[in-house]
């Protein structure tokens, strides 16, 4: 697949561990000082040893100035209802000065989700519920839309809901998608595809891009409008290999999963400049 031409950006993926509670905040602040574009946190609300991700994002927003913020990805079955999630994300965007992105997942670890009070869904139900949730979220954000909001879905029924507030900027919706049905949803409704390289099958990037691009065109969208992100592990790929993923598979945001300050510093000082150099030469 081609390079979609998006600006090259980098992010960190930090565990929201609560012992000590201030540690994820310090790593987020370090990420900002090192020049990363985003800091992201996984979302497992059923884990007692994790901070609540949404509370953490709000606290990090208050303790940083520039860096973008996102869940990676928010567990939709436990972030209910979507209208409230829409207002929460718009509020964070307003308070942070337009730094919020909304990473969403259909749900995983269903035993834990159900134990915490969430509804267990089949894979197809999860896709449908996420699709409906996106409609609700975008409808709430559309503060100048006509009248009140109505969404009559299988999982979410919103009737006569007030719209707003509008976020400070157009919040991108990134979907964590590994399977074809979810990738199809990315192409139809999302602003970004956020898979994880460690769990991806060989050839997963070009295969996923093909599904997303076809779905986007079928929906009357330009595939180039969809950002391609990728979670990566330290040392998993060389700078040359990462640059190749940009030039051949369109990945424009690489997200480093590490809680090691030294690793974050080395990646920022060595890998990021090398990737930028390779991509710049490849794009000329």
What is the predicted role of each segment?
Residues 1-284:
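Active-site-adjacent structural elements that line small-molecule/cofactor binding pockets in enzymes
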């Amino acid at each position: 697949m081609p390079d979609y031409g998006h600006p090259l950006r980098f992010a960190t993926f930090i565990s929201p561990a609560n012992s000590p509670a201030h540690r994820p905040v310090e790593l987020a602040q370090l990420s900002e000082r090192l020049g990363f574009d985003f800091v992201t946190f996984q979302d497992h609300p059923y884990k007692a040893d994790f901070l609540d991700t949404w509370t953490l994002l709000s606290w990090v927003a208050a303790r940083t100035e520039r860096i973008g913020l996102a869940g990676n990805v928010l567990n939709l079955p436990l972030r209910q209802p979507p209208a409230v999630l829409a207002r929460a994300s718009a509020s964070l965007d307003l308070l942070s000065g337009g730094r919020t992105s909304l990473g969403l997942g259909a749900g995983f670890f269903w035993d834990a989700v159900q134990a915490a009070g969430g509804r267990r869904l089949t894979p197809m139900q999860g896709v449908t519920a996420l699709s409906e949730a996106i409609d609700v979220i975008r409808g709430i954000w559309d503060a100048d839309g006509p009248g009140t909001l109505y969404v009559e879905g299988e999982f979410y029924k919103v009737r006569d809901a007030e719209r707003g507030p509008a976020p400070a900027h157009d919040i991108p919706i990134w979907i964590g998608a590994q399977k074809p049905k979810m990738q199809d949803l990315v192409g139809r409704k999302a602003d970004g595809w956020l898979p994880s390289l460690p769990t991806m099958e060989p050839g997963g990037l070009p295969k996923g891009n093909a599904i997303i691009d076809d779905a986007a065109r079928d929906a009357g969208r330009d595939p180039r409008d969809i950002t391609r992100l990728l979670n990566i592990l330290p040392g998993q790929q060389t700078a040359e290999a990462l640059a190749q993923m940009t030039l051949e598979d369109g990945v424009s945001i690489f997200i480093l999963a590490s809680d090691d300050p030294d690793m974050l510093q080395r990646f920022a000082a060595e890998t990021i400049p090398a990737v930028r150099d390779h991509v710049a030469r490849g794009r000329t």
